[in-house]
UniProtKB/Swiss-Prot annotation:
The protein, known as: Structural maintenance of chromosomes protein 2
A Pfam family it matches: SMC_hinge
Organism taxonomic ancestry: Eukaryota, Amoebozoa, Evosea, Eumycetozoa, Dictyostelia
Keywords: ATP-binding, Cell cycle, Cell division, Coiled coil, DNA condensation, Mitosis, Nucleotide-binding, Nucleus
Similarity field: Belongs to the SMC family. SMC2 subfamily.
UniProt domain SMC hinge: residue ranges: 520-639
GO biological process: cell division; mitotic chromosome condensation
Superkingdom in the source lineage: Eukaryota
Species this chain originates from: Dictyostelium discoideum (Social amoeba)
Amino acid sequence: MYIEDIIIDGFKSYANRTVIEGFDPTFNAITGLNGSGKSNILDSICFVLGISNLSQVRVDSLQELVYKKGQAGITKASVTITFNNSDKKQSPAGYEHLDKITVTRQVAIGGRNKYLINGHNAQLSRVQDLFHSVQLNVNNPHFLIMQGRITKVLNMKPPEILAMIEEAAGTRMFEMKKNSALNTIEKKQKKVDEITKVLAEEITPTLDKLRGERTSYMKFTNNQTLIDRLQRFIIAYEYYTYEKKLESSEFESFKAEIDKGQKRKKDLTLKSTDLKAKISELAKQREKETNLEEMDQQEQKLSKELVKYQTSHKHQKESLDKEEGAINNLANTREEIKQSIQQKQKEKQSMEKKIQSIVEENQQINAELKTLQNKHNTMTTGISTGADGSSAAEDGSYTEQLMEAKKTAVNAASEYKQAEFRVKHLQSELIAKRKAITQEQTDHKKLQAEQELVEREIQQLTRSIQELQLDNSKQQELTEKKRQLEPLVSKLREEVGNASAQLSGLEFNYTDPSKSFDRSKVKGIVANLITLKDVETATALEICASGKLYNIVIEDDETGKALLSKGQLKRRVTLLPLNKVEGRSIDPQKIKNAQKIAPNGAVKPAIEFVEYDKELQPAMNFVFGSTFIATDKKYAQKAAFDSSIKVRTISLEGDEYNPAGSLTGGSRPPSGSILTQIQRLNENNRCLRENQSQLEHINFELVQLKSVTDRFKQLEQQLNIKQHAASLIAQRFQLNPHHQLLESIKEMEKSIESDTQLITNSMIKEKEALEKVKQLESQVNDFQSIRESQLKDLEKKIQITKEKCIKSNKIVKGEQVFIEKLDLEIQEMDNELENLSKETQGNQGTISKMRKDVDTLARSISETNKQIQDIRETLSEIRKDMAQKNDAIRSLHQELEKIQSEITEIDMSTEKLKSRMNRVDKDRQEASKWLEAAIKKHTWIKNEKQLFNRPGSDFDFNATDPSKANSEYIKLQEEQEKLSKTINRKVMSMFEKAEQEYQELMEKKKIIENDKSKIEHVIRELDEKKNESLRTTWKKVNKDFGSIFSTLLPGTSAKLEPPEGQNELFGLEVKVAFGDVWKETLSELSGGQKSLLALSLILSLLLFKPAPMYILDEIDAALDLSHTQNIGMMLKQHFTSSQFIVVSLKEGMFTNANVLFETKFIDGVSKVHRTVFNKKDKQVGKKK
């Protein structure tokens, strides 16, 4: 099958209907300038073949295939290809009867897309099947070779080259089928898994459950037979026992024992009366004695008073000692203050003398300043000039300056000499005072030690107070808390009392059945043992529990028996022993189903809404375990009546939905839910316990802190006293001779330092004055020339003198201020002396009063001691006498108790015997009635009565223990009762059906697994055949590959071989030889040589299974003319049965073609011209 002609209309650059006819069956070439439309011819062929990847035809949408996208008035693109089908061997499947096949594809603006085969509409799938059957798959186009594909082949890895061989061999289809088969296996495996899952999750559990039910059913039938046999045995034993009771003689023996006991009781009663009379007489004699209890109380009272007096006396004595010490300290302080006043007055007088000399010095400085200012004025004003040119006044002025300078030098010398004398005198006096201070050091050290001691005591007291400060603050805080808690506890106690009164029915009162009874085994009423997680569920939970809310939870059945028999219960109760009660719970699957129909926890088991101790789990399951609670009536109704759930459900409003079909609801008690009230009572009880415990703890801490508080106050008082003592010591320091000597030494050291500085300054002053004398003497004859400089010097001196004057004025004022300060200090000391005198007078009165109190307390202590001694002597005598009488009474009481105990035992024995007599009599009557009733009810007794208790018979009571038989009977009855509730009476038929389903599924599973095994076996066989076919293909392609490459590039050879260390099934790589030398890599090849190598490989693959048509699009673009010509020759030589359509721009390629089509672009439209090459290379042209 090959192309005969192509009709293009409105497709891409072919605006008008263009018929391209006369295609050669073997070799056709298309050439033309770039953009002339040569590649559009190839695009039109791909378009008809049904290409889906439009990027290969260089457009993004079908509308772009229309000429100028329909903007030039052409709205449809159509391509028709006529195929010659005369060679029936290459004919598509189903078209062997046709010699020509016409395929048309049209696309219009707006998206209409249409296919026609021989003028008839066809689906895309039909068109694709037509071309696929002759290896023309345009969406996987091996027949279409483009330059880009050649480039890809150069970069392929060994597995990718192997994949091309597989494609050529056709084993790719096998891989697809293999993958499909593997998918089938996977599906079958999923089916097996589903069957396994159904077996594991549904059938097997159901079968196991039915097996268990079948076992239970068979056990039920066997138990029933055994129960019937045991029942006859037990009835026979009871009949035998009752007969023996009728023949018993216990009644007479009991009566004889009673008479004997009554006689003994009469004798003991007479003896008891005599003992009571003796005890009464002794008690009267003891009561006549002095009242011992009153005397004991009086002794205790006096002892307390004595301790009180002794404590007060001690405290008063200590306070008196302190006050007397304080008076002595005040006297010492007054004396020290008087000495300080005298010292200050002396210091004032000394300062007044000192300031007088300073004032005189100040006046001298002022006079010097005035003289300098006058001299300055004289020099500034000037005097008339004499014949020699000098001024007499100025001469006189210089003379005055000269005299003044000499005077200054003399004064300065006098000053430093006087200062040297004073320094010498002060130094000698300083030595003397330092000796004196050493002598006074003892008293000073003593005073200093006293001050350090007081300061240490102050520090110690301060630390103690700081340590107790926290406790003092804590006491205030605790007192405030106590004030807040007391009314709160009182209020809570009242609320708990009122609530307890309203809920008095929820109390369980009983008497201990025995002395060793453990009350912890009685857990309490159910309502008191739970805590609600949500108060809103209270009504629903109360409806759920109903009467069980008031049941009593106990640890075991033995506790229950003890309570019922000996607990003296005042009302009828229901007990729930934890070891016996059967907890019921909802099936987990039903809970899951409920959660599906009511999302977000709208339906939950009632037990999830309460909190309780884990040990109470069985009882809580019994009360709440089998009911749902729903947040909404809608969900409650669904949970109750849904076929997959059917569980009793209660809404939050209290409406009950029963799966049996009943609905219960209505009004609620106005007092509210009992559970809510209990919850509130429990919460109040908890708060009361917490607050009461907190209050008790606070009271306890306050009691402990009371002593701490007293200690804190005492320490504060002591600290104040010590601080006052410290201030007095400080004042004594000021008046101490040692201290005064220290101050005097400091003043003398200052004076020495000042005079030393004065000596230095005076010597400098003298030196400056002498220099000035020399200078004035040299300047007298030349006054006019230096007048200006002298004026400046004079002004400078005036400035210095002014500063001295100001400084002197400040010193005078400072000294005057110091004298005023001394006056104030003297006045303050006088005031303090007056205050101390007043304080001393006040303390004298206090001491006098305290001495009287101490004496009074001492007398009280003496008198109280005497009273206590008298009372103790009297008490000793009375106690001795009473001890004797008490011993006698105690002895008589012991004897009386023995008699009373024996009488009680006789009474109890008599009561027991009477009870047993009554019981025996009653038993006889009951036995007679029971025997009569048993014979009527069980007719078999008459016939088998002679066998009762006969050895070897079914009623051998010695061989079979009746009590064990009875226990076994009760146990079987209980077991039978449980089984009757749970057994499935249809289990036998259900088990057979389930087992049949199980066998069927197992058979299906076996079949599927066999099918899977067969498919896997076939795949293994086909894998072997595929590998064989692949090897055959490889050899054929390898041969053609070398032949084609040798044709394209003479003198070379090429082959495909596996990578080193691997076989051909893992991959193939290309090897090239130039001459006889094989190259290790392809890197030595030029670009053109690599392109020829890749093209050779592609063509060798195509040659293995030739398609009817091949399209080559500019594959020679990278090749020179010689190689291009070789390609044309190779195509003619190797591809004789396929049609080639080659697009090329090189003459070496298309000169080998039989038909050449040239494209041109004229007036915006592509045109085609056909040229036929004959064997003599003559051209025949025809324009289309």
